[in-house]
Amino acid sequence: MRTGELGIYLSSLELYCELLKDSRDYYVICEDDVFFTPEIRKISSIVNNCPEDWDMIFLGTNKEYCKKENSDRSYSRLTGKCMPGAFGYIIRKKCAQYFVNFGFPMEEPIDGLFMRNFENLNVYEYSPNCVFVDYDDKSTTIHNSDEV
C-alpha cells in the first residue's frame, strides 16, 4: 500500500468513528482533489430519493474502470464487479460501523475494502456524477507516493 492510500484509509476510518458519535445519519466524504459538478447541490435529494436500504452512495465514477455514465438521474446497485472510485461518496452510520468493525487489519486501499464488501452492503452509484477526479492531473499524490 502506498503512503497516500494509507492516509486515506486511516482518515476514512477516523471519519467513520466521528460519524458514530454524531447525531447525523450520514456523512458526505470527498478526497481533497475532487472537482464538483452542479449536481453536488442536490445531496439531500439524492439521499431522499435513493432506495431506502442504502448503506453507501457513490457520487462519481472512474470511467476508466466503470464505463457507464448516464445523464438521467438514476441509481445503480453495485455488486463488486466495478469500483466507481472512493473519491466521493455518502456513507450511512450503519455502514460506518461495519467498516470500523472489519477495517483492520489493513490489507489494501480503502476502495478495495469497499469493493470486497459490496455483497454484504447495499451500495449504489448515483448518476450523473456529482464529483470527479482528473487522473491526468500530475498534482494528485495518491498514486505517486512511496510504498509503505
Place the predicted regions along the sequence by residue.
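An acidic/histidine-cluster motif and surrounding catalytic segment
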Residues: 1-30, 34-148
